[in-house]
Every structure is written in C-alpha cells, then in structure tokens.
C-alpha cells in the first residue's frame, strides 16, 4: 500500500501473516480418528467483534487527534474476520492505523492437535518470524521486536523504519493472541520532519497500537 505526503510516495508493504481457515457451520466430532481436534474448544471464539466499532473514540482521539477518514475493507472470512483502517491527514499530523482481527478454526494443517488455538498460535509465530526476518521480496528491514506482557495471551510489538529517500516512515506493528484469535495492529507515521508533516514518536505509535489491540480483545465473547 502507498501513502503519499510532501510530494513523495512512501511504499509500505505490510505483511499481515494470517492463514484464513474456512469455518464450517455443520456439526463436527470433537476429534478425528487420528486424534486431531475438529471442533471449537471451550474458551475459543468462532467470531470476532466489528473492529471499526471496537476501537474506542477515546483511543482514536488520543492517538489520532483530528478529522479521520475511516475505511472498512471487506472480510474474506465472514464474521471470523474484521478489518478497519483510519487515516489522519491534518498537517502537521499524518498517521495511519490499520486493525485486523481473525478467529482461527481447527485445521489439520496446524501444529499440535490441530485445534483452533494451535492454528492461531502458528499464525502468531509466523507473524513474529516475518518481522524478525522479513522475506527478501518485501524490501522491509528487520524489526526491533519487544514483548508486551498483559496484552491477551501473548503479544509483541515490532518497529520498522522504512526509508524512501528523502522521507522515512516509522511502522509499528502489534500482534496479540487470545486463545484462537489474533489481532494485528499497524500504526505508522513520519519518522522525520517533512515539508508538511512532523515526526511521530515510536513510543506513541506502540502505545496507540497496543491500545487499539486491547480495545478489540476486550470485546471478544
């Protein structure tokens, strides 16, 4: 995706590593003959909340203060997935917040017993690996990764500085897992002063991304 400010195009390729599993509404046995889990277990979620409604106005007002443009991309997985993007473009402020929530289903391709939680754990680990060691074709730098205790079952934050001369963008990604749900938040803004915009601190980006993720996780039921 490409964000433009000050006459310069900043190409930011955001890889949200998420393997979409089709949810079945038909009854299923708890385990298959080979011991794999084939249905949702207690505490797992079959749907996710609507992200656009879950991120609170308080969070948006604190981290994206100003008039926002909101877009709700179409889900490719029904009620098991929800996406929402907000853009703040009021010089000297420029920020983009992207939030995705995905509920994973049991899968024979998952590790462990194939449960929905194992499927989500696999996706979480793949996302972490992609930040530490980005695929060569993405042209993204390796991220500075930190853990975020107390956010979901497990969570991490990853900061990447995307340089497209003469400008640079700070890209903060927070990925949090709660049972079989993975919430991915990408929050970005200018790294340095530009002709129209001022920089945004990495600390603010991480705090905003974590707050958005916490908002979504709090609505799981």
Predicted regions and their residues:
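Intrinsically disordered, low-complexity Pro/Gly-rich regions
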Residues: 1-9, 18-20
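Hydrophobic single-pass membrane-insertion segments
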Residues: 18-30
């Amino acid at each position: 995706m490409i964000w433009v400010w000050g006459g310069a195009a900043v190409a930011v390729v955001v890889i949200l590593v998420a393997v979409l599993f089709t949810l079945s509404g038909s009854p299923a046995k708890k385990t298959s003959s080979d011991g794999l889990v084939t249905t949702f277990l207690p505490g797992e979620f079959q749907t996710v909340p609507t992200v656009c409604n879950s991120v609170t106005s308080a969070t948006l007002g604190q981290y994206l203060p100003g008039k926002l443009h909101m877009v709700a991309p179409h889900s490719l997985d029904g009620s098991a997935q929800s996406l929402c993007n907000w853009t703040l473009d009021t010089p000297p402020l420029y920020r983009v917040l992207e939030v995705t929530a995905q509920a994973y289903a049991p899968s024979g391709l998952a590790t462990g017993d194939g449960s929905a939680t194992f499927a989500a754990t696999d996706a979480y680990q793949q996302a972490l690996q992609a930040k530490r060691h980005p695929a060569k074709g993405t042209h993204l730098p390796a991220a500075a990764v930190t853990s975020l205790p107390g956010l979901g079952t497990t969570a991490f934050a990853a900061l990447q500085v995307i340089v497209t001369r003469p400008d640079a963008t700070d890209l903060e990604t927070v990925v949090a897992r709660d049972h079989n749900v993975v919430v991915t938040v990408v929050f970005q803004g200018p790294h340095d002063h530009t002709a129209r915009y001022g920089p945004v601190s990495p600390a603010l980006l991480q705090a905003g991304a974590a707050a958005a993720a916490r908002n979504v996780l709090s609505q799981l039921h």
